[in-house]
Amino acid sequence: MANLQNGINAWIFLNEDEPPQTNYNSPESCYQSLVDCKVYDSASFLGIAFFEVIPAAQGSTIQIGNSSHPGGLTNQDYLNFVLRDARQVNPGIKFLATMVYSGANTLAAVFSGSGDPQTQASNFANNLVAYLKDNGMNGLDIDWEGDVSEKMTRSQFQILFSAIRNEFDRQPVKYYLSFTPAWPTDTTDYSAVNSKFDFVSPQFYDGTPLSAFLDAGISPSRIGYGAQFEPGNAAPNASAQQVWSMVSEGFSFGSALYDYQDIFVWRFNSGNFQFEQAQFMILDQLGNPPSSNIFDDTPIINAAGNPNLTQMTIRSGDVLNAIQAVNTGTGPYNTGTQGTGTGIFTLLQHGGNSGGAQTFNIPLNDPIVSISGYTGVWYGWQCVLQLSLTGKSGVTYGPFGSMAGSATQNRFVQPAPAGQSVVGFSGSTVTVPLAGGSQTAIIATLNAVFA
């Protein structure tokens, strides 16, 4: 059960460069993989961290926090680049300014001095909207923990976010207000949370359970799911499948069952960025299954750092019904969350659920270097009739598919270029009728992805 009214979203932390000593424009940079692999295409909202409160001509406003990067670039440069590149990849993406939670420049600074709190909040709200308009951004995200949650009073909370909501609602286009608390606090006005914010994504990865937020007063109809794929995280934050299993089931509160309203993932660019970005793309496919009959593992596998294919599940009968790949990362940036030195990427199944399923493991030191088989016509349908896979050592897996009922058989072989191996697949499916009136998808065309 999942509604995800507010989408599948992620944060990006502009202070950090990965790999170390790279900058935004380095070909191997975590920022370039977001563009090259079209990771941004999987995000509804991008929270850009961290913004600070600064004085303005009248009251206060926001600016991106200061940090320097190799090559003389600044966080302002990075902000400009991200806004440009993410929207080129995904014209529909929405940008949230994520506010800093510690130090002297949190949202609590809006109320510095001895002015009238309502006037201070109104001035900030006006300046905030002007900043968002000038920079092509779509809203504000509140990381509620640490200094900001300790220095701002409950009354100030209500005044500030009411003023922001009122100013947002006066605009001709929609502006969004997001609340991402690490834990409940006494300074939170929960009536304001429920009435002023568009969505609420608790940071469950910090260990506070859902029940604590609901018991504190957050409406169950507002709740989203905060996830994280950084090293050190255990289940249910160790894979896209684990997060989706939690979210898709929804949750009970009182006697009712509720959907989570969004997923918000911290973040795109830690030292585990290849794992994070690829898992995010898989999570998007789980939440928004591709509607096309065409499939291509290439973008996800590239984002993951082209890890070896280490397990296959193949469904077959007369023909090749479905394939599903599992890849294992062993590099410095794709080794998962649990300190095992490996990161597991379980891709989506391509094809239907008919035929018998066989799962086999592929040793890391004996990668698949060739696929072969037959295509042809099966009861009038052009499809892949049979598939075999061959490892570097010469070991063969298969054949899968008996070719019974086929009218034609055409042999194919796809060997990997020297020094490369099979890391995924692309192709298409076709839906065919089955005996008894049902139908299923089978593999119509298939190509190996090499890296």
Residue ranges and their predicted role:
Residues 247-264, 412, 423-428:
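Cysteine-clustered segments with highest specificity for TGF-beta superfamily mature ligands
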